[in-house]
């Protein structure tokens, strides 16, 4: 105890400033999704994430082939594109893509960020619904570097959307590829901020990513074996995820890799009953996803069912000309094991409409 107190007494003024930032986060709406990137021996890369919300998001899994004609569904200048790569994606309400992995091993995760501010449409660039942001990346890029090279120049503008219940769908985007490269995309004060590099292996929600990194730096000074913050606040989850990711075993055993990532994201999951009135994002974890990018396997776990099931992308024909297929998840019988054969042909959906952020002010 004496040594611990001495360490606390040596905390610099800068560190106390970080504590003030941490306390200020408590006064803001708290978001509750988390994402980690595990890198193991022999080129293993595994991404895990949680999805937390106050009500059902009516999640389903979709298998999209290459060669699909797409529309960004964001007004007269809506972006049009053709999918270059096939992918498996998790959708909300069958109107927006929240998560996915493409056939090249690129994983995209959408997480809530209440402090996002998007620029209003300037009338000169194509527009894209935020509900289609993740799918555009999955359709278009094979690596994080490819995506950053194009997206940093903002070739399109994002149209905001309103979620069922009237809540704004303000988000940030994380990418990781089969090499372990990683990137975070945020809109802060109307400007795109990109964090690119393998060091960006953990993401939660508010505050902005640079502040999350600063807060995590403080807790690294304290030392996770001495104390870890335990609430469901994003900053606390960021610290716990970072610490336990650093403790994860470096193993070539596939089962242990997947189990390690599941154990980390379960640690940062919010319990059933964690609902705060007026804050839909401070809520129980609805589901968890782990993506094995080296082997092309997409694992899924619903909080209220006892089993994990997974999709081996190599068992899905995602080539040009193949049909769009869907696997019902939330209202389906309990599933376990590999489920690629259970996808059924389905008519493609239209992305949720994205509108000019200027109209929301």
Predicted feature locations:
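N-terminal secretory signal peptides that target proteins for export/translocation
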Residues: 1-11
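Bacterial N-terminal signal peptides
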Residues: 15-26
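C-terminus-biased signal that marks the final domain/tail of proteins
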Residues: 31-46, 159-163, 167-169, 178, ...
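A contiguous strand-loop segment
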Residues: 32-125, 158, 336-337, 341
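Short acidic-glycine loop/turn motifs at beta-strand connectors
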Residues: 39-42, 102-104, 176-180, 186-191, ...
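Structural recognition of the beta-strand scaffold that forms the well-ordered cores
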Residues: 46-48, 107-110, 174-176, 184, ...
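Proteins synthesized as precursors that undergo proteolytic processing into mature forms
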Residues: 124-160, 254-263, 272
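Catalytic cofactor-binding cores of redox enzymes
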Residues: 153-190
């Amino acid at each position: 105890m004496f040594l611990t107190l001495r360490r606390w007494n040596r905390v610099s003024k800068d560190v106390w400033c970080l504590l003030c930032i941490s306390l200020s986060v408590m006064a803001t709406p708290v978001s509750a999704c988390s994402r980690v990137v595990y890198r193991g021996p022999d080129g293993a890369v595994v991404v895990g994430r949680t999805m937390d919300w106050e009500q059902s998001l009516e999640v389903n899994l979709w298998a999209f082939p290459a060669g699909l004609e797409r529309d960004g569904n964001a007004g007269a200048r809506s972006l049009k594109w053709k999918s270059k790569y096939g992918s498996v994606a998790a959708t909300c309400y069958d109107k927006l893509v929240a998560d996915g992995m493409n056939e090249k091993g690129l994983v995209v995760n959408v997480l809530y960020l209440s402090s996002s501010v998007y620029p209003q449409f300037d009338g000169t660039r194509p527009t894209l619904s935020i509900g289609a942001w993740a799918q555009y990346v999955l359709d278009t890029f094979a690596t994080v570097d490819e995506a950053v090279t194009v997206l940093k120049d903002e070739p399109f503008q994002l149209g905001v959307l309103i979620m069922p219940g009237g809540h704004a769908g303000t988000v940030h985007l994380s990418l990781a590829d089969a090499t372990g490269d990683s990137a975070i995309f945020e809109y802060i004060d109307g400007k795109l901020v990109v964090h690119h590099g393998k060091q960006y292996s953990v993401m939660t929600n508010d505050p902005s990513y640079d502040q999350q990194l600063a807060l995590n730096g403080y807790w690294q000074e304290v030392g996770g074996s001495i104390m870890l913050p335990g609430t469901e606040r994003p900053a606390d989850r960021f610290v716990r995820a970072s610490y336990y990711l650093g403790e994860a075993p470096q193993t070539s055993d596939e089962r242990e890799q997947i189990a390690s990532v599941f154990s980390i994201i379960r640690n940062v999951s919010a319990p059933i009953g964690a609902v705060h009135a007026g804050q839909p994002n401070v809520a129980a974890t609805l589901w968890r996803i782990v993506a094995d990018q080296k082997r092309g396997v997409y694992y899924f776990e619903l909080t209220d069912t006892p089993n994990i099931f997974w999709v081996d992308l190599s068992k899905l024909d995602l080539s040009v000309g193949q049909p769009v297929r869907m696997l019902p998840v939330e209202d389906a019988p309990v599933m376990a094991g590999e489920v690629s054969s259970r996808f059924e042909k389905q008519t493609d959906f239209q992305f949720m409409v994205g509108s000019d952020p200027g109209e929301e002010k």
